[in-house]
Amino acid sequence: MAELMLAESEREQIRNRCEVVLRQNWREGVRARDGFAFGYTCPSPSRYPWQWYWDSCFQAIAWRRYDPDRAERELRSLLGAQRDDGFIGHTIFWNQPLTGSRRYVYNVISPTDPTTASIQPPLLAWAWGIVIGEPSAEPGLVRHHEWLAEHRDLEGDGLIWIVSPDESGLDASSQFDGIWRHEAHGLPGYLRLVRRNRRLGFDLRPIARAGGPVCCEVVTNVLYNLSRLAMGQPSLTPALIARTYDEARGVFLPSSHPSPRGTPATTIAALAPLALPDLPAEIGRRLVEEHLLDPAQFWTPVPPPSVSAADPSFSVRDRGLFGQRRYWRGPAWINTAWLCWLGLVRLGYESEAAELAQRLGATVAGAGLREYYEPRTGAGMGALDFSWSSLVMDMLDPDLRGAAVSHLVS
């Protein structure tokens, strides 16, 4: 552990770099149709120019230590993109409509739409509670949760379902190999999936009636549940355990219609329930001790990889030989590491939480704020100056008491 400890000067350099990246990625303007003044952090200026739902939530949580006003504005801008019925899209284009090939591969009904017709993991109310205050007092968040319950709860147990791998935020994760198969990986299968969902309006029930696939995905529901808890709504943790917990393997796995083919991969989604404040301790300890802290699986030099290093699907390549998307099939990401870190703190694994923070801090010090990292070497991968990777500072908090932790353990 001693050799992992970052000097205070290194922490300060990381802190300063996080602030520089957040500030340089900040965008603001006025919506042309109604004069709404928006402000958001683009994930990375070179690759991701728009506002992404879950990115904005993570970025607002990171912003709160540097500029609370921008943290709040980020979330209010996301809510400002809401439709009248409560829907909030995966991507908001803010006066920059889709062009070129993106018109065909993005989840939109029409290329002139102001947002995608797809969702992302709905953690806005949770982030709102961390950054701004009581989310249940905001009518737009109430409408958002009403929309999710009405349109995405397929089976009446409160859990929500997705119609595309991208709606999970985990894109081509190997947890979807037995569900969407080649349609999750890239062209041409992914184009077929987009066209099929577009014909059905990205509407869950017609898609399910047509044979799907549709999926009850773990990360999506963990973050949705955290938002529900922040709203004062009943917990979905019992329903999530009943539907997705594989007691024999000691991990959480996606449920789908049709049922997945083959043995589901063990991915970072399997550990995401660690972030839930009411996850039974015995389940949490199994996730930590049998999986997260196992060097052969998730406790790699830069932990945790997005797929268990012991899983046959583990790969650290950005792309496959034919352009398949691979970046959620092995590389380590800061946002999912942060969710695991929250669980370690909540369950009392403070030395392991500190070690995770130190390893990731050292990685960021060496490679910068990248989209994701090679979990064995720490090499930076993907986009440069990636905004949500500034969450590393929440893990480097010397007292292990970020605002998100206090919401989980108090």
Question: Language-model features: where?
Answer:
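Hydrophobic/aromatic-rich effector regions of fungal transcription factors
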Residues: 105-133, 339-343
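Alpha-helical support elements that line or immediately flank enzyme active sites
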Residues: 56-85, 228, 269-280, 337-350, ...
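Extended glycan-interaction surfaces of carbohydrate-active proteins
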Residues: 3-51, 75-114, 157-215, 239-331, ...
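Conserved structured core elements
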Residues: 50-53, 68-72, 118, 122, ...
